[in-house]
């Protein structure tokens, strides 16, 4: 990864020769497979001003024999080409290096039962042509039973398992067992897999999954400025990320190679890791049981608060309305702050613009996070205390800004209408601590029930925090529903620290993945954290301080988003790596 090495260049040929030598040193007896470039690949080559005539995708294939050649083999896969203009230390020299080191480690552990096939694909950046050639033409394709693919969309951060083959329940169970001892621990979530399936993106693993193969796709996406960038050098690459993805790949592949049987397609599992320590997984139907448990605990807490603290059902309804206001106003503010950093949606009309926005992503994340904090502080201060006209004015300006800079957005318009309506609702506040807390829990449980019915793999993001909040509320009733003793605050503090800390890390991953296009996704994270911490909010006497804090956060958010433009200006087109 010293120099860019796209298909057809001298540097590409040098990298190919070097890798063949390294594979031979590791006892893989490498062979080459040449395949035709697709029309889309040819078009990309010609678009950058080069000739495609005579070029092919040349895969490098190595085999580490197992003790039983009749068993289905394991496959480790990465691509060795880069885009023009980028050395590709992360994408995907890191994956190639990690695989070669994993081969060395697997050999050192002694012979495995299954054969390991190493596939370093070519022309991935052009149109996944190397993977297509292997899985459609190579004789080994029918021997593969499980796949571990390594990728990168950035130059750092924790490596995450973000894609599986179809029907992944058995795959997830094996991945969880395999990565218990991985350096850095497991990092994966069924929501990420669900969302990735809906995206137009693809990697070499996409071709394997289309054949129905079990397996996992690993990648890190932190330090997004390095993606397809001249800055993607070995010195700039996060060595911790390389270690993490390598350890996950090694332990998973080694587990597959020594397993009595490989995972098969069954149902999809619901799962997520807890702070990288373990993977919680269960069948989709279990989500309904968790919802029922959370609803029961919430009902118990409401009963206790009603009898001990005089809770009225109308206050719970106001708490629900406050949560809807937070979601809608947070989305409006997030979109406005986001468009200050650059175009969004269909207005991102070139690779140059896309990569420039990636470099600005850290600025966007902090800015959008501050915008969400502003909405939270305004919620806690009270719309009436701040001034309904003042809040409405801010929301309208934010909506107009989004429309002018970002274009027509029906979701944003709907959110603006909801936020304005609730801002002027005269009976939409004064829900009290218990009403506000339980109302937010009820809102999240309702959202969790909808998600459980439509997409159970995504519902746990709502169900788990709601269950934690419901447990805390029920425990608080048992300790002291009047919230007079210090001990009564303990359940909410514990839930906020543990579940809230998990959500903060989750939110960072969400923004790295989809924040450029859907910044309002952080509104869900904000709602969940407020749900956990709602009883800890200060008394109404501190409303002025909260209002000042909200204004300061929003102004700082706008300033940071604009600063991203100045700090990361759009470079000349020639300086951009175009895939």
PLM-predicted stretches and their roles:
Residues 294-579:
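Alpha-helical transmembrane segments of integral membrane proteins
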Residues 1-282:
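Soluble extramembrane regions of membrane proteins in the secretory/endomembrane system
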Residues 106-110, 170, 174, 178-181, ...:
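Solvent-exposed, well-ordered amphipathic alpha-helical segments
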Residues 264-294, 312, 357-363:
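Cytosolic-side membrane-insertion boundary helix
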Residues 142-163, 287-310:
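C-terminal domain-closing interface element
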């Amino acid at each position: 990864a010293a120099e860019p090495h796209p298909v057809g260049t001298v540097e590409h040929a040098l990298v190919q020769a070097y890798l063949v030598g390294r594979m031979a040193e590791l006892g893989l007896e490498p062979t080459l497979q040449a395949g035709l470039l697709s029309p889309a690949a040819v078009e990309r080559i010609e678009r950058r001003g080069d000739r495609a005539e005579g070029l092919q995708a040349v895969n490098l294939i190595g085999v580490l024999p197992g003790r039983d050649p009749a068993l289905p083999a394991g496959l480790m896969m990465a691509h060795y080409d880069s885009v023009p203009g980028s050395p590709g230390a992360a994408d995907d020299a890191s994956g190639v290096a990690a695989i070669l080191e994993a081969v060395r480690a697997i050999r050192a552990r002694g012979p495995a039962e299954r054969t390991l096939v190493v596939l370093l694909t070519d022309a991935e950046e052009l149109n996944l042509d190397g993977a297509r050639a292997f899985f459609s033409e190579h004789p080994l394709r029918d021997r593969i039973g499980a796949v571990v693919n390594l990728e990168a969309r950035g130059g750092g951060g924790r490596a995450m398992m973000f894609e599986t083959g179809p029907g992944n329940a058995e795959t997830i169970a094996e991945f969880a067992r395999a990565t218990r001892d991985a350096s850095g621990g497991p990092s994966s979530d069924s929501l990420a897999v669900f969302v990735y399936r809906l995206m137009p993106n693809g990697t070499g693993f996409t071709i394997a999954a289309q054949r129905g193969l079990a397996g996992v796709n690993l990648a890190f996406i932190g330090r997004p400025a390095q993606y397809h960038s001249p800055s993607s050098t070995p010195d700039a690459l996060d060595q911790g990320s390389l270690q993490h993805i390598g350890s996950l790949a090694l332990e998973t592949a080694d587990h597959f190679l020594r397993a009595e049987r490989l995972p098969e397609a069954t149902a999809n599992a619901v799962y997520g890791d807890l702070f990288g320590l373990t993977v919680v997984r269960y069948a989709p139907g279990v989500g309904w049981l968790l919802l029922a448990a959370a609803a029961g605990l919430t009902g118990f807490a409401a009963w206790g608060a009603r009898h001990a603290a005089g809770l009225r059902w109308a206050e719970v309804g106001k708490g629900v309305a406050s949560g809807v206001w937070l979601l809608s106003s947070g989305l409006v503010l997030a979109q406005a702050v986001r468009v200050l950093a650059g175009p969004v949606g269909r207005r991102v009309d070139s690779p140059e613009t896309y990569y420039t926005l990636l470099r600005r992503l850290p600025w966007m994340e902090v800015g959008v996070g501050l915008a969400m904090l502003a909405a939270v502080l305004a919620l806690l201060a009270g719309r009436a205390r701040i001034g309904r006209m003042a809040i409405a004015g801010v929301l309208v300006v934010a909506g107009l800004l989004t429309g002018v800079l970002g274009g027509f957005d029906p979701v944003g318009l709907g959110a603006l209408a909801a936020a304005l309506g609730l801002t002027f609702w005269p009976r939409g506040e004064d829900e009290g601590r218990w009403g506000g807390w339980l109302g937010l829990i009820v809102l999240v449980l309702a959202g969790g029930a909808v998600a459980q019915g439509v997409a159970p793999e995504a519902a746990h993001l709502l169900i788990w925090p709601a269950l934690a909040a419901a447990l805390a509320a029920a425990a608080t009733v048992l300790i002291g529903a009047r919230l007079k003793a210090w001990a009564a605050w303990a359940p909410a503090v514990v839930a906020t620290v543990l579940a809230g800390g998990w959500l903060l890390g989750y939110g960072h991953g969400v923004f790295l993945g989809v924040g450029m296009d859907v910044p309002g996704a952080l509104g869900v994270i904000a709602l969940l954290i407020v749900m956990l911490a709602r009883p800890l909010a200060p008394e109404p006497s501190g409303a002025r301080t909260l209002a000042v804090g909200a204004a300061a956060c929003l102004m700082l958010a706008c300033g940071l988003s604009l600063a991203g433009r100045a700090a990361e200006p759009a470079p000349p087109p020639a300086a951009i790596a175009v895939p």
